[in-house]
């Protein structure tokens, strides 16, 4: 039961972490692009 819960938490956290990193990189890219202009 605990193993299933932990695996569910991990599987839920991985996409959220990847999405957060992607959004952060995208915002930094947009900010740098605006500064270059």
UniProtKB/Swiss-Prot annotation:
Transmembrane portions of the chain: 5-25
Database matches in InterPro entries: Cyt_6/f_cplx_su5, Cyt_6/f_cplx_su5_sf
Keyword entries, A-Z: Chloroplast, Electron transport, Membrane, Photosynthesis, Plastid, Thylakoid, Transmembrane, Transmembrane helix, Transport
A Pfam entry, by short name: PetG
Family label: Belongs to the PetG family.
Quaternary state and interactors: The 4 large subunits of the cytochrome b6-f complex are cytochrome b6, subunit IV (17 kDa polypeptide, PetD), cytochrome f and the Rieske protein, while the 4 small subunits are PetG, PetL, PetM and PetN. The complex functions as a dimer.
NCBIfam families reported in the protein's UniProt record: PRK00665.1
Protein name: Cytochrome b6-f complex subunit 5
Source organism: Nephroselmis olivacea (Green alga)
Lineage: Eukaryota, Viridiplantae, Chlorophyta, Nephroselmidophyceae, Nephroselmidales
């Amino acid at each position: 039961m605990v193993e299933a819960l932990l695996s569910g938490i991990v599987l839920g956290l991985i996409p959220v972490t990847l999405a957060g990193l992607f959004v952060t990189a995208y915002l930094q890219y947009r900010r740098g692009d605006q500064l270059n202009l």
